[in-house]
Amino acid sequence: MDKIIKSISKNGHFRAFALDSTLTVKEAQERHQTWPTSTVALGRTLIAGQILGANEKGDTKITVKVLGDGAMGPIIAVADSRGHVKGYVKNRKLDYKKASTGEVLVAPFVGNGFLVVVKDMGLKQPYSGQVDLITGEIGEDLAWYFLSSEQTPSSVGVNVLLNEDSDTVKIAGGFMLQALPDATDEEITEIEHNIKSMPSIATMLTSEEPLKTMLDNIYGDMEYKNLGEFPLEFKCDCSKERFLEGIKSLGREPIEEMIAEDHGAEIICQFCENKYEYSEDELKALLK
């Protein structure tokens, strides 16, 4: 099972999350049948959603939108505070452009644009924050969002490693580190050095204790407390009933057209690819 470990330095000056999201991204790839570059971009956005969701409490829903002008098109992830995430990428069929390290580059396909984060806390108006994409590689863009919109200095790393022979997901995960108000400049410099000199996310995720390895590398000589492990998973909350309500909201005329022309309806959820079919009788019942 995928999981996240939440932690805080013993002096209370820093906090960090470490995530193993391998099964989450695998399921997304299988459901959407994405090609390599699209898989990595969607996977990173899903992990970003899980990081933001882990920051929240209660029934808050987080929507992450990567809105670039490149060939990728929009990438959307919706997460909650319980570790659930769902998402999709507009262009599923983008293939390799590798860096010299062998990692897949997504920025050339994301292009220029915005990272938008919407927090729905069940109040009248959801909170929405928007920043420019500074790299298009997702992790750095999320760190910029935290600094720009939430005034919290942060470092974020997210990555997806593919099996070279099959283009399926081998491993996926990431981390978030945030400096809290009492952190000194000296401590921040120390943590920055740790993050710059630590192994790649892919290397750490393939170690024996991946999440502990990640946190040990982030904190270095600084002592920290493990605040607990929490499950993560790809989970969509769509249902036949929910989509039926959506059809009902279209009004009489479109429903009558569906009955006359198609003798029913079929809806495919864009977040998870589940298919729902509605008979003529089910549609007629909406008109009563």
Curated annotation (Swiss-Prot):
Posttranslational modification: Under oxidizing conditions two disulfide bonds are formed involving the reactive cysteines. Under reducing conditions zinc is bound to the reactive cysteines and the protein is inactive.
Lineage top rank: taxon: Bacteria
GO molecular function: protein folding chaperone; unfolded protein binding
Cellular localisation: Cytoplasm
InterPro entries assigned: Heat_shock_Hsp33, Heat_shock_Hsp33_C, Heat_shock_Hsp33_N
Disulfide bonding pattern of the chain: 236-238, 269-272
Cellular component per GO, a single term: cytoplasm
One Pfam match: HSP33
GO biological processes: protein refolding
UniProt keyword annotations, A-Z: Chaperone, Cytoplasm, Disulfide bond, Redox-active center, Zinc
Function: Redox regulated molecular chaperone. Protects both thermally unfolding and oxidatively damaged proteins from irreversible aggregation. Plays an important role in the bacterial defense system toward oxidative stress.
Family classification: Belongs to the HSP33 family.
Protein name: 33 kDa chaperonin
Source organism of this protein record: Lactococcus lactis subsp. lactis (strain IL1403)
Organism lineage string: Bacteria, Bacillati, Bacillota, Bacilli, Lactobacillales
